[in-house]
Amino acid sequence: MAVYTQVSAEALGAFLARFDHGELLSAKGIAEGVQNSNYLVETTADRFILTLYEERTSTDDLPFFLDMLDHLAANGNPVPRALPDRRGVAIQQLAGRSACLIEFLTGVSISHPTAAQAYAAGAAMGQMHTSLAGFAQVRENPLGADTWQPFLERCGRDVDSIAPGLFDRAQTALTSVLAEWPRDLPVAAIHSDLFPDNVLMLGDRVTGVIDFYFACTDIRAYDLAVMHTSWAFDGNGENYDPAIGAALIEGYASRFPLSDVERAALPILARGACLRFLLTRAWDWLNTPADALVTRKDPMAYWRRFEAYRKDDLFA
C-alpha cells in the first residue's frame, strides 16, 4: 500500500456520507506498497481501508478484482470485500480517482515468519486456489513473462545506476529464463503478489489475505513460486531459510494438490518471479515521485534471490 493522492478531510467526509458506515473520526495514509493510494479510515461505526486507484491500476480491471474477492469471500476465504454505498455501487470517484471503501480485517503482517506461520500461509493460498477453480473470469497478466523483455528495455541502462552492469546481467538472466519458461502448465486466477505484508495473522492463524490488485490469470504454480521468493528469504535476499520454504510448500499441498510436473517447474518459475520483481522494483526505484508517501523497495534484493535459485535447487 502507499499514498500518491492526498485527500482532504472535507472530501473524505463527503465521500463517507454516501455510505451507512458512520462519520469520519480519523484517516491515516499507509506508506507500505507501491500500487495505489491507501488510507486507514476510522468512523463512528468501524475501521475501513480507503483505496484510491492510481494509474498503474486500470479502472477497467476493477470489476475482475472485486468479483474475485466476492467469490473468495463467499467460499470462506478471509479476504476484504469492497463495500457498496446506499445505491449498491462499490466503485466510487474521489479526488479524481476511482476509489473503494474496503472492509478492515484484523491481524498483523509478519516480518519474520516462523515455519508454522509459513505453513498456515501456504495453506491459505492452497485454499484460495481450490476456491478459484470455480471462478471463470479471465484477466491477462500485465506483468507476465511475455512483458519482461519490453519492461527491461523500458528501464534501459538507467538500471546501471542501481548497480553497475545490472542491465547486461539482467538481460543474460532474462534470455535464459524465457528460453526455459513452461508454456503448458495449468492456468488459473492467481493472486501473484502474496508477500508476507499481504497476509494478516494472529499468532499462527491467517486472518486476512489482502492487496489483490496484481491478481490475474496465469500459471497457477507461479503464484506459489512468487510466495516462495518472498517468504523464504530475509528482506535483503541474502539468506534463505529452508524450513520456511518447505513449510510453505507443505502447507499449500495440504489444501491443493501440486502435481509432479508443477513441482518440477517451481525452480524456473521462481527464477522468473525474481526477474519480474527485480524489473518492477527497478522501475519504481527510478521513477517514484520524490513527494510520494511510499517506501521504495531495493531491486537488488531480488537479484540476490535470483542468484540463489540459479545456483541451487531450493525446492529439493
Label for each model-derived stretch:
Residues 260-270:
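All-alpha amphipathic helical-bundle segments outside canonical DNA-binding/catalytic cores
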Residues 1-86, 202-205, 315-316:
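Conserved NTP-binding catalytic cores of kinases and kinase-like/nucleotidyltransferase enzymes
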Residues 221-257, 272-289:
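Active-site activation/catalytic loop segments of kinase-like enzymes and analogous catalytic loops
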Residues 111-165, 185-187, 293-296:
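A cross-family kinase active-site recognition segment
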Residues 43-137:
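ATP-binding pocket architecture of kinase catalytic cores
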